[in-house]
Amino acid sequence: MSKRDYYEVLGVQKGASADDLKKAYRKLAMQYHPDRNQGDKAAEQKFKEISEAYDVLKDDQKRAAYDRFGHAAFENGRGGPGAGAAGFDFNFGSGFADIFDEMFGEFMGRGRAGQTSNRGADLRYNLEITLEDAFKGATTTVRVPTSVACESCNGTGAEGGSTPIACPTCNGHGKVRAQQGFFTIERTCPACHGVGRVIKDPCRTCGGQGRVRKEKTLSVNIPAGVEDGTRIRLAGEGEAGLRGGPPGDLYIFLAIAPHRFFQRDGANLQCRVPIPMTTAALGGSVEVPTIDGSRAKIAIPAGTQTGHQFRLKGKGMSVLRSPARGDLYIQVVVETPVNLTKKQQELLREFEKAGQDGLHPESEGFFAKVKELWADLKD
């Protein structure tokens, strides 16, 4: 059974904002949550479906992959939600537990204990590469503005070697409870904002954040055969976590610059090559460039027309994680001579006078059909 469109599952438009997605998910999750529909298998399945849809659409990277490839973005080797294009594993992390705790922790008295640190944000970096780099692979460096752990406090956020203490308001749990009727309402602690710890003496360098802004220089390995839009994950190279929390990841988005000779079609390459009229008429050979830097010679049969295509097997792009290569397709364009000398013009006129019957079968056939059409119109 084919999966439903994720936007349809949540009942939102494709261009819905993050807030719209969250509101739609909260409403549906409250309606179909198993605790409210005990024993109802249909509701349980519906809850799983909307959870899966929200898990993908709430994440910018996974949503972009879904918008481009649909459900196929997470199948056929892409490894499910959290895998990237071309098989790279990006492990975005669902974050479903966060919204679950936010909704049902407060409503039903659930929720995780507060943590002393928060994970850093993931970062995106757009990198343009050449077609040659995509063909053979490359190693390049990027400079990324980010945040790193504060050296003064070793990322703790506390000044002078002191350590954070348990929040006295929530006793280190990160949440406070209040009884309302039959329900126990659990909310994020307003004193520590859910961290469970407070800093009495904040670090003067980072202001108690445990991290500072800095530009990092990183090396990026680009494998041979990558395509436009491929994403590469550099684990742990995102923003530093808050007060010693784990860092996020950095995602490199590749864009392949246009090439002056070649156009790419998957693993194949296409190239238009002009040839002289005389070569097309009499036959001959031409040398053409290839993506690996070598030259290939093509034999041009006599009578070759514009648009004729030659295939050079194995002269195309590399295939990711494979020794195979695509093909190179050469399309010839017969060039009409310009700026003829008087002598050249005379020779062409002599050629024309020598007789044209059978020399131009396509044009002769075309005009023969035109004459027939005119004759039919007169009748």
UniProtKB/Swiss-Prot annotation:
Molecular function GO labels: ATP binding; heat shock protein binding; unfolded protein binding; zinc ion binding
Cofactor binding remark: Binds 2 Zn(2+) ions per monomer.
Cellular localisation: Cytoplasm
Entries under Gene3D superfamilies matching the protein: DnaJ domain, Heat shock protein DnaJ, cysteine-rich domain, Urease metallochaperone UreE, N-terminal domain
Cofactor: Zn(2+)
UniProt GO cellular component terms: cytoplasm
UniProt domain comment: The J domain is necessary and sufficient to stimulate DnaK ATPase activity. Zinc center 1 plays an important role in the autonomous, DnaK-independent chaperone activity of DnaJ. Zinc center 2 is essential for interaction with DnaK and for DnaJ activity.
Protein name, per record: Chaperone protein DnaJ
Source species of the chain: Rhodospirillum centenum (strain ATCC 51521 / SW)
